Regions:
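Transmembrane beta-strand segments of Gram-negative outer membrane beta-barrel proteins
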Residues: 1-5
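Outer-membrane beta-barrel porins/channels
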Residues: 8-15, 24-29, 35-319
Length: 319
């Protein structure tokens, strides 16, 4: 379980409107694993891979982006099998069933005051994942790589665009949620001390959502990369802790108004405690969000000095 609390504020280029667009949200994940035979493990994951909650305050008639916003919700169910080829090498693969729904509003002077709104009904579709891992348990070495396929969706829509006389017009839209690649690494570097690192690339530029009435893309996102580097330390048989740095490189400073940040640098501090058959983990993350400009045919708002504070809690029970 995690709660994410972004502070995303900016100033519009018209009337110096002050925007506060970041809204807090939560994410919940459930995981179950079971060794069903010697060398074969089955896993089940229920999570929320994507989410967004953005709303621009201000009068749409007197501000660049007042009334623009987006709400995105998703759910995913993954069934994953892992097979140990030998003591060092394993392979894993699985299927993912994913649902996505959203509502997007485009308004303000930047959009010509068109007061556009689209509801994208829930769409469910399937994708897959595949990967492999190499490990040497004696030195706590493990390297794993996983590729996640894109997922193709087709959803019913309802659009409203008053300047064209369009009111609750039904339609459909086709889009994909992006493919991604994960690389994870860990190794022991001293007694009771672990070095961790990871890399993730998500191909968000593949996301094109073009509703019929609007006739243009709702969002224009850049591909994202994330690097992490951390150190974990076991203080006793029951207690361990970790510190992890995270980094996302900056891209084009002009970004979609529905995601007005550009890269980040963050730090996470976590602890893990064993109580009988249960393991309780918790942590906090602080991230400095990169400066960005909301782009609608040019810069419409400057976002600087923003951050995000997140808290997480995880409970593992063996039986």
């Amino acid at each position: 379980y995690a709660t994410i609390n972004p502070s995303v504020t900016g100033v519009g280029t018209i009337a110096a409107t002050e925007y506060d667009v970041g809204k807090s949200y939560t994410m919940t994940t459930f995981t179950y694993t079971n060794e069903i035979s010697d060398g074969l493990t089955l896993g089940l994951i229920v999570d929320q891979p994507y989410g967004a909650s953005v709303l621009y305050n201000g009068d749409p008639a007197a501000s660049s982006l007042g009334g623009t916003g987006a709400e995105l919700e998703s759910q995913a169910l993954s069934i994953i099998g892992k097979y140990d080829v030998n003591e060092a090498v394993s392979v894993h693969a699985g299927l993912r069933r994913q649902s996505v729904e959203a509502e997007v509003s485009l308004n303000g002077v930047a959009y010509g005051g068109m007061d556009y709104d689209v509801t994208i009904d829930k769409s469910s579709s399937s994708g897959w994942l595949i990967g492999a891992a190499y490990e040497i348990p004696d030195i706590a070495l493990r390297v794993s790589a996983t590729y996640f396929s894109e997922v193709e969706h087709s959803a019913d829509t309802t659009e409203t665009l008053p300047p064209l006389g369009a009111n609750n017009v039904p339609g459909t839209v086709d889009f994909v949620t992006p493919s991604a690649f994960n690389l994870d690494f860990q190794t022991g570097i001293a007694a009771d001390t672990l070095l961790t690192a990871s890399y993730r690339r998500s191909n968000y530029s593949d996301l094109d959502v073009v509703p019929t009435v609007l006739g243009s893309d709702l969002v224009n996102l850049n591909d994202a990369q994330r690097f992490t580097l951390g150190v974990g330390r076991r203080f006793s048989d029951d207690l361990s802790g970790s510190v992890t740095l995270s980094y996302e490189p900056e891209g084009d400073e002009l970004v979609s108004p529905l995601g007005p940040t550009n890269g980040l640098m963050g730090i996470s501090i976590g602890a893990r405690y064993t109580v009988g058959e249960a393991i309780i983990s918790g942590g906090v993350n602080y991230s400095k969000l990169g400066d960005a400009q909301a782009d609608v045919g040019g810069n419409r708002a400057d976002f600087t000095g923003n951050s995000s504070l997140s808290f997480g809690l995880k409970v593992e029970v063996g039986f």
